[in-house]
Amino acid sequence: MNSTSTIIEFTGEFWTYFTLVFMMLTIGFFFIVTSLVAAILNKLCDLNDHHTNSLDIRTKLRSDTQLITRAHEESINQSSN
């Protein structure tokens, strides 16, 4: 019985195309990953700004309420004198 084998020769041209395709796939992969990370960070920054702004609004409302209460107390004190 004769044994048959297949010989694959990797010529210089094969390695050139292999390297080119591998490089393109690697660059594409990093581009996709970078885009996803940028989108996630952008979304997180938007959420953080929303919470920061809502906290500022609550703080502003709280200080406005305190100012109104103090003004009301002063008017009561003036009317009682």
UniProtKB/Swiss-Prot annotation:
InterPro entries, alphabetized: SHP
Cellular compartment(s): Virion membrane; Host cell membrane; Host Golgi apparatus membrane; Host endoplasmic reticulum membrane
UniProt entry keywords in alphabetical sequence: Glycoprotein, Host cell membrane, Host endoplasmic reticulum, Host Golgi apparatus, Host membrane, Hydrogen ion transport, Ion transport, Membrane, Phosphoprotein, Signal-anchor, Transmembrane, Transmembrane helix, Transport, Virion
UniProt keyword Phosphoprotein present: yes
Record field: transmembrane: 20-40
Residue ranges annotated as Virion surface topological domain: 41-81
Glycosylation (residues): 77
Entries under Pfam families matching the protein: SHP
Post-translational modification: Four species of SH have been detected in infected cell cytoplasm: a 7.5 kDa non-glycosylated form (SH0), a 13-15 kDa form that contains one or two N-linked carbohydrate side chains of the high-mannose type (SHg), a 21-30 kDa polylactosaminoglycan-modified form of the protein (SHp), and the isoform generated by alternative translational initiation. Of these different forms, SH0 is by far the most abundant protein detected during virus infection.
Documented activity regulation: Channel activity is inhibited by copper. Also inhibited by small-molecule pyronin B.
Positions on the Intravirion side per record topology: 1-19
Membrane topology annotation: Single-pass type II membrane protein
Keyword Electron transport listed: no
Cystine pairs: none
GO terms, biological process: proton transmembrane transport
GO cellular component, one term: host cell endoplasmic reticulum membrane
Family per record: Belongs to the orthopneumovirus small hydrophobic protein family.
Assembly: Homopentamer forming a funnel-like pore. Interacts with glycoprotein G; this interaction occurs on the surface of virion particles and infected cells. Interacts with host BCAP31 (via C-terminus); this interaction is direct.
Stated role: Viroporin that forms a homopentameric ion channel displaying low ion selectivity. May play a role in virus morphogenesis and pathogenicity at various stages of the viral life cycle. Accumulates at the membrane of the Golgi apparatus in infected cells and may facilitate virus release by modifying the secretory pathway. May enhance host membrane permeability and disrupt cellular ion homeostasis, which can be sensed as damage-associated molecular patterns/danger signals, triggering NLRP3 inflammasome activation and inflammatory immune response.
Protein name: Small hydrophobic protein
Originating organism: Bovine respiratory syncytial virus (strain 391-2)
Designated gene of the protein: SH
